[in-house]
C-alpha cells in the first residue's frame, strides 16, 4: 500500500497542517491548523506516446533516475494548464526531439503503489529526425523483435508495448486499461 505524501504546511497561509477527517468526508486529510483549508492528495498523471514510424516504435534510454540507462516510451509528468494529449506531445518533443502527429488515447494504467496514472497515446512520427533532450541518453527506433524487453524501465511501458503490438497484429487499435498494484 502506498504511503501517502505528507503535506506538512498549508498552501494558502503556510501554517502547520494536522491530519484528521473533515466533516462529511470518509478519510483523513491534511487540514490547516490556522485557516482550516483542506488539502487533498491525489494521484499524479504521467503522459506519453507510442511514437510509430512504419513497423518501428520509438524508445528513449533514460539519462535520469529512476531507472537510469533503461529504455522507455517518451513520457513524463503532466503539467498544470495542459491537456493529457498536450502533455504527451510535449514530453515526446522534450525527451526524443521527435515530430509526431497525435492519434488516439491508447492505454490508461493505474499504478496504485506510487499514486500515479499513466496515459499513453498512439502517435505517428512525421519523420525520423531525433534530438534527445537532457533526460534521454539516446532515442532509437525498434521493430518488435528488436525491443530490449529485458531493459525496459517500467511495467507500464512493457504492458503498453505488448498491447500495441498485439493490436497491430489484429489490425485494430482500442483503448486498454489496467492496474498495477
Predicted regions and their residues:
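Active-site-adjacent beta-strand/loop module that shapes the phosphate/pyrophosphate-binding cleft
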Residues: 109-132, 140, 160, 165-168
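Conserved Nudix-box catalytic region and its N-terminal flanking loop in Nudix hydrolases
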Residues: 52-94
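Charged phosphate-binding loop/patch that engages nucleotide di/tri-phosphates or the phosphate backbone
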Residues: 168-181
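Acidic, metal-coordinating catalytic segment for phosphate/diphosphate chemistry
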Residues: 2-48
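A short coil-to-beta-strand element that immediately follows conserved catalytic motifs
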Residues: 20-21, 99-106
Amino acid at each position: 500500500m502506498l504511503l501517502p505524501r505528507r503535506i506538512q504546511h498549508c498552501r494558502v497561509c503556510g501554517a502547520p497542517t494536522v491530519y484528521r477527517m473533515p466533516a462529511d468526508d470518509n478519510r483523513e486529510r491534511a487540514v490547516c491548523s490556522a485557516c482550516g483549508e483542506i488539502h487533498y492528495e491525489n494521484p499524479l498523471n504521467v503522459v506519453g506516446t507510442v511514437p510509430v514510424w512504419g513497423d518501428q516504435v520509438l524508445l528513449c534510454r533514460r539519462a535520469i533516475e529512476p531507472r537510469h540507462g533503461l529504455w522507455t516510451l517518451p513520457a513524463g509528468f503532466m503539467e498544470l494548464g495542459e491537456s493529457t494529449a498536450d502533455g504527451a506531445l510535449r514530453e515526446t518533443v522534450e525527451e526524443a526531439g521527435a515530430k509526431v502527429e497525435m492519434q488516439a488515447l491508447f492505454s490508461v494504467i493505474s499504478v496504485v503503489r506510487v499514486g500515479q496514472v499513466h496515459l499513453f497515446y498512439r502517435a505517428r512520427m512525421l519523420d525520423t529526425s531525433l534530438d534527445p533532450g537532457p533526460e534521454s541518453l539516446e532515442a532509437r527506433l525498434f521493430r518488435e523483435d528488436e525491443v530490449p524487453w529485458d531493459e525496459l524501465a517500467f511495467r507500464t511501458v512493457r504492458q503498453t508495448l505488448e498491447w500495441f503490438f498485439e493490436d497491430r497484429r489484429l489490425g485494430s487499435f482500442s483503448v486498454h486499461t489496467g492496474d498495477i498494484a
